[in-house]
């Protein structure tokens, strides 16, 4: 077994795992009840995917017309695939059905397999702006507070503001601002 610590390969060649935790990393640790031969394999630190949307089909590259009837199962499968690929933490930066929150809570409770999820819920966007179909539209600070309130009520881990347009939403451009700097500053102050 090769062990990569994020900077270099280290001389240790054994990992002792108890339950879900790494108990020890060393050289030729004693063989326990269950040993797995990892010859030719490399262990790395868990990867972080900083921008996912578990609600979206990664193969479509377009906004959904309506939620898929099997969306919870599809999201669970996507989360499982992430873990199998070495992703141990992911930030879900937008959805409209709140199902990523249920999945996050099930993963945290040990009921589902998936990475640690940090969820933002409905991103704050301008009316008709990027990802408006997720329900986070706000044209002023009063409307932005309403979106923020929904996020807090759902225990959002972070708040996402669509400062510019994006490629997913027709008529929206990543180079065009959606909000004034003053409104963004107000939203950030309230979110803190």
Show the residue positions of the predicted features:
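N-terminal metal-binding scaffold of metallo-dependent hydrolase/deaminase domains
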Residues: 1-31, 41-43
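Histidine/acidic residue-rich metal-binding segments in metalloenzymes
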Residues: 102, 143-192
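Short, acidic/polar
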Residues: 71-79, 139-152
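A short, structured active-site edge motif that brings together acidic residues
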Residues: 118-125
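Metal-associated gating/positioning segment near the N- to mid-region
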Residues: 41-111, 127-130, 182, 186
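Conserved beta-strand scaffold positions in the cores of enzyme catalytic domains, especially
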Residues: 33-37
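The substrate-binding groove and active-site-proximal loops of carbohydrate-active enzymes
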Residues: 133-138
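Divalent metal-coordination and catalytic microenvironments
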Residues: 1, 15, 20, 40, ...
């Amino acid at each position: 077994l090769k062990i990569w610590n994020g900077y270099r390969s280290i001389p240790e060649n054994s990992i002792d795992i108890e339950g879900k935790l790494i108990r020890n990393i060393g050289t030729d640790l004693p063989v326990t009840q269950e040993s797995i031969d990892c010859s030719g394999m490399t262990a790395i630190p868990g990867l972080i995917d900083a921008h996912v949307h578990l609600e979206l089909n990664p193969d479509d590259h377009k906004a959904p017309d309506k939620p898929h009837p099997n969306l919870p199962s599809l999201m669970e499968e996507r989360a499982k695939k992430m873990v199998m690929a070495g992703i141990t933490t992911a930030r879900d930066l937008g959805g409209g059905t709140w199902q990523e929150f249920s999945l996050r809570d099930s993963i945290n409770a040990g009921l589902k397999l998936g990475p640690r999820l940090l969820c933002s819920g409905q991103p704050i966007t301008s009316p008709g702006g990027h990802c408006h179909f997720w329900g986070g539209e706000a044209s002023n600070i009063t409307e932005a507070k309403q979106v923020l309130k929904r996020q807090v009520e759902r225990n959002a881990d972070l708040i996402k503001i669509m400062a510019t347009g994006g490629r997913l939403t027709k008529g929206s451009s990543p180079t065009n601002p959606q909000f004034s700097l003053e409104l963004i500053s107000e939203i950030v102050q309230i979110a803190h």
